[in-house]
């Protein structure tokens, strides 16, 4: 599941003009993907967004390996229909926004495993993410959590690896947490939630973050927008793209304030602009400007809490 920030270059109109709203607004591309011999289930509006990150990872891997190289995503390209690969509704910025999330998550995961070599990675709303394949070190245990329909489809493209456990269920319940603690009672855990929390009310997200505190030795990293960014998402994005059925709610103005709302001794470890660590070499001027505007006003950010 994913939200991608939009550029301010006028989309496909060729018109350039600075619009701060467009620097954070996302496009949802609803696609049907079929594997031979498999009928894809009907996904709801939120589930349908799982295809956007795959397109971004493939695009970056083909054109901007300095941002992200994803061999597994490339290997799946020929299994996807041409209709999905026709990215006319997106542009360089929207595609690289998805790839940038993956690059950011990789950085946090690798840092966590350097600090906690016995740690576990749990991906919430994993969709068709290929994070495991980019970061597998040969011994770390991974868990991937998503809804049943999504997980069933994921298995057709990405069969369950030896060191990654697929868990079909509600990311906001404690079932997957209990499973992890049965398997590894005391191991440190990094929970990642890429492009997920936007779709849920604040109290729902806070309930999950508080629940993590109850299971001990847990950290969570996720991407978010700030209040002004969310306002733009609601005002422009849904009406423009005709996807009002995929509503968005959760935003973070201050990671420190979020930690106080969580309570339970939670603390904000990091809050950083989304594109801070992204190599912008070779990008179009409009893409660079969009990234710079987003970072200047902290419209999109990475948040790390434990």
Regions found by a protein language model. Give the residues of each.
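Rossmann-like AdoMet
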Residues: 31-122, 126-169, 180
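Conserved beta-strand signature within the Rossmann-like core of class I S-adenosyl-L-methionine
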Residues: 216-227
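Short alpha-helix
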Residues: 247-271
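Short, glycine-/aromatic-enriched active-site segment of Class I SAM-dependent methyltransferases
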Residues: 231-246
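A short, conserved alpha-helix within the catalytic core of class I
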Residues: 199-211
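Short amphipathic alpha-helix with an adjacent loop that forms part of the alpha/beta core around
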Residues: 175-185
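A conserved beta-strand element that flanks and buttresses the S-adenosyl-L-methionine
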Residues: 191-192
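Conserved catalytic loop of SAM-dependent methyltransferase domains
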Residues: 266-293
